[in-house]
């Protein structure tokens, strides 16, 4: 299997996967709707330096990863903005295959590192650790609700 660069004709599959993944256990996000997820996905794809891929499995798209490449003084960083695997395809190694293919693809593009954010209390945290990602101890995410 190979990653396929995201194109607009993949939108419906990505939207389906996103809504299914984020409204199913363990997340069960009731605030995720098809409408607001569609706007969110569109916004991400319009981000400067956007680079997204879809992962086909069994004749259909079963996962995607969206991000952007940031060029820093000391190298190029791919920031994962969203990643999801179709809940019907989870626990089959698709996420790990997706990450391995993404890492190879990004290396060939001259990207030096991948960064992402997740919550410590989600299965995704342990998935990323299992795949070699480490917590940056001195970094914190800050927010202020207005």
Describe these PLM feature segments.
Residues 54, 60-69, 79, 84:
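Conserved beta-strand in the GNAT
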Residues 1-16:
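A short beta-loop-alpha structural element at the N-terminal edge
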Residues 49-50, 64, 137-141:
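Short hydrophobic/aromatic beta-strand or adjacent loop that forms the aromatic wall/cage
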Residues 70-80, 90, 136-139:
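A conserved beta-turn-beta hairpin within the catalytic core of GNAT-like acetyltransferases
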Residues 2, 19-41, 50:
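Conserved GNAT-fold acetyl-CoA-binding loop/helix
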Residues 96, 108, 112, 120-138, ...:
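Conserved active-site alpha-helix within GNAT-family acetyltransferase domains
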Residues 80, 114-118:
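Conserved hydrophobic beta-strand within the GNAT/NAT acetyltransferase core sheet
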Residues 85, 91-104, 130:
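Conserved acetyl-CoA-binding loop-helix of GNAT-fold acetyltransferases
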């Amino acid at each position: 299997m190979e990653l396929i660069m995201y194109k607009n004709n993949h939108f419906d599959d990505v939207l389906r996967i996103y809504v299914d993944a984020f409204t199913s256990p363990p997340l069960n996000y009731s605030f995720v709707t098809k409408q607001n997820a569609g706007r969110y996905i569109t916004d991400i794809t319009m981000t400067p330096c956007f680079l997204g891929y879809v992962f086909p499995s069994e004749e259909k798209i079963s996962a995607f990863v969206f991000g952007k490449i940031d060029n820093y003084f000391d190298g190029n960083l791919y920031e994962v903005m969203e990643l999801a695997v179709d809940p019907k395809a989870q626990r089959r190694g698709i996420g790990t295959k997706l990450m391995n293919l993404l890492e190879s693809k990004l290396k060939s593009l001259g990207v030096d590192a991948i960064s992402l954010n997740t919550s410590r209390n989600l299965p995704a945290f342990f998935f990323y650790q299992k795949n070699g990602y480490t917590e940056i101890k001195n970094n914190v995410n800050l927010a202020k609700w207005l």
